[in-house]
Structures are given as C-alpha cells and as structure tokens.
C-alpha cells in the first residue's frame, strides 16, 4: 500500500473517501465540523438521529454528502476526546484500515492524524498510523496451499497534516514507519516459520541475503561449530549437541559511520529455532510454540534490516545466535559442567535453561568489537511472563543511562519495557558446589537471576538485557509472532542517530 502526506482543507479533497473522527457523545472533531458546515449540517443531523454515538470502534459510511467533493465520508468513533491516548489512537487507525477494505475503498484521505493525542506530535501520529496500517494488513500464508485472498482493495492512504510546515516531518515519519514496519514483518515472518524450515542454517541464509541486498555497507559472517570450538565457545556448543542441525552464529555488520572512533552498538539475539528443553524435556502441550524461541534473533534481524534501509549514520552489529535444543545420545545433561568462552565454569542443573548458556558465550565473543553498548534480546524466562504478563518486556542493565535510553525509546515507540533490578543479593542464588556458578537459581526471581547470570559475562562494556518471553508471540486463536521489540530497538537507534521524532 502506498502512503503519502499532504496539507489541505477537507472540503477541497477530491478522493474516494475522507476519514474523520467523531467523539462521544456525538461530538464532531474539528475536521468533521468543517465538513458539516459546508454540507449545511448534514452530518450533525445524522448524529442527532442516533446514527453514531462516537464510541470507540463505531463507524458510519456516508455517500455523496452535499457540497463535498469526495465520494464518501467515513466517520470513525474515537471515544471521549480527553481520553484519546496512544493505544486508542492505534485502535482507531486499525478500525479505519479494516473498514476501508471491507467497504471497497481504493484510496482515502485520512484526517485522523490531526486528532489531539496527549504528548504526541504529528510525526508520531503519522508514523504510528503507517506502522499500525501495515500491522493490520499482515498475514502469514506462505505455507498454505489454498490461499484465500482477503478483500483488500485499499491501495493508497494519504495522511493530512494541519499546515505545510509539518509536511517534511510527515514525509520523514512515513519513511521511518515503512522501514520499521518492514523490519517487524521480517521478524514476524522468521518467527512464524516452522522449525523444520527455520533452523540455524536458514537464519544464516537470511543474514547473507541481507548483506547481498545492502552490499554497500553490510557484511555477514557465519561462524560454524568448528570455529566456535576453536574460539572456546563450549557452552554455546553444548546446547546444540543433541541436534542434527549445526549450530551457526551469524554476525551482521552495518557500517554507517566511517569515523575510526565510532564504536558500534551490538545487538545479540537468542536464536533457539526449536527448544524441546533437551534432557529436561518440556511438557508436550504447547511445545509447538517453542519454534518462537528464536524471536530474539528474528527481532535483531528485523532491526538490522531497518537500519540498512534507512542508512542510519551509526555502526550497528547484529548477532543471530542460531541453535536447536534437542534430546539425544549426544545431548548435554543435568550435572554437566561447561567451560564458557570467558573461562568461567557453569554447572548445568536444567538443560531447559539453555538460552543463557548460548548467550553467555556470544556476550564474551562481542568484546572484540569494543562496543559502545551491547543489548541482548531473548525469550529467556517463563518467570518474566509471570512478572509482567504479555504486554511489557522485561529490561535489566548494568548501566543506568543505557537503561533510561531504552525505557524512553519504549515510551516513544509504544513498544513498552519495564526495568527489573540486578541486585547482588540475587547473585547468591546462582552458587554451585561444583562450578563457578549454576545455570539456574531456583524459582524466586527467576527472570532476575537469569539476568544476573548474563551480567557475569558483560563486565567489559555497557549492557542491557531484554526478556521478551511474554511479548514475542501470541497464543490462542490469534497465534503468531508479534515482531517485538523491533519498534523499541528501532526507536533507540533512531535516537542514537539523531532522529528523536521532534518536529
């Protein structure tokens, strides 16, 4: 679908459809009032007759309104004006896209971007409208033989801004929104792929294709098991021992700043393409969803795609830590003691706490890049789901300014995170009688002790950890990957690149 931005009054728009808002109780938005005035009260008369209350999600499609050049006007209920927040704004946009498609509109001029959303400017409203529209239209049917094509006639959406001064920021918002939406789609597509297709080799092939598409300043290196062995990544290797699929670590390097002192930001994604739990095997119910255990790597891939598409003037490295945790005659066992790349030893008490065993070696590996900051993204703990549910990502960090940056980016993007502590008292739960540490610390504070485990391998740089176990995918009827936290990390990198969304 094509997006553009313009500035103009509604009475001068000649389009298939104009979209305007109506508030509760039957209150016209300023743009709707203009249309009502030129139509001699036609719209307000309909509202007085009870055709539309203005409640969230209500719609009313008007045809051939007197004195209006456009063929149709779509009235969208926006709820109470003072209560219109970010979440409700996105829901209104989603309802708009679905209604326009259902009613056969091929193009529309949308004035909803002129609604007042507290604390949000036109750049934010246009960008969120683009991202929400693309999210609404997303489907994953690549593997279906009988594809039922949904009715999607909508081809063009024009967002209106109040004055010509906002056109530049509106165009930038569309550019950024499309790049972020493409990154989210890429992450969702990877996450939704079945594990018999999407293994570590598949992740590596996608990373190579990304480098081919942006060969100007993106290179990809794939590190196999033999090289990992030479590097001393025994913890990472142990996790994949039970699988017939080779563990592969894909390193994507984007160079947007040629300055010698421009240190990179490193993103590390957990890429367990299937997690059976290993010898500590998971229950069969819901095990199919363990294909989503690579959503951290999928998100990093999506972010790298966004960065390359926008050619941000920063250096970013993305690492996809591909692996598969399976039971078998060669699988690692509870009771094993592993020597990590850092030299520290780990006693394995549970083979289903494997993500941290992969990540700890990758976090040591990335020291060679002398990073500005390292952020790992992982579907790491069920404990984080218990703590924060399915709406907010868990954040831990060893550097307060980095944590504050990520929280700010989460608020800007609407892809929210909440910081959890990393106190020394939690480290005591990882004590082992036979190694430097155990790979689990018991049930209390499980998300935090997992973060504490990782923190032992991040002492040489500023680091943050995003636990997306509760936010990376949805279960039930709407089962599927969400693409989070691509939007959060994209905003973080946009801020680092100087695009903070201010007009």
From Swiss-Prot:
Pfam families: Peptidase_M17, Peptidase_M17_N. This is Cytosol aminopeptidase. Binds 2 manganese ions per subunit. HAMAP family: Cytosol_peptidase_M17 (MF_00181). Probably involved in the processing and regular turnover of intracellular proteins. Catalyzes the removal of unsubstituted N-terminal amino acids from various peptides. Required for plasmid ColE1 site-specific recombination but not in its aminopeptidase activity. Could act as a structural component of the putative nucleoprotein complex in which the Xer recombination reaction takes place. CDD domains: Peptidase_M17. GO terms for cellular component: cytoplasm. It comes from the Bacteria. Disruption phenotype: A quadruple peptidase disruption (pepA, pepB, pepD and pepN) does not grow in M9 minimal medium, grows better when supplemented with casamino acids. Mn(2+) 2 binds at residues 270, 275, 293, 354. It catalyses: Release of an N-terminal amino acid, Xaa-|-Yaa-, in which Xaa is preferably Leu, but may be other amino acids including Pro although not Arg or Lys, and Yaa may be Pro. Amino acid amides and methyl esters are also readily hydrolyzed, but rates on arylamides are exceedingly low; Release of an N-terminal amino acid, preferentially leucine, but not glutamic or aspartic acids. It is an enzyme of class 3 (hydrolase). Its EC number is 3.4.11.1, 3.4.11.10. GO terms for molecular function: aminopeptidase activity; DNA binding; manganese ion binding; metalloaminopeptidase activity; transcription antitermination factor activity, DNA binding. Belongs to the peptidase M17 family. The active site is at 282, 356. The keyword Manganese applies. Mn(2+) 1 binds at residues 275, 352, 354. The keyword Iron does not apply. Inhibited by zinc and EDTA. Its cofactor is Mn(2+).
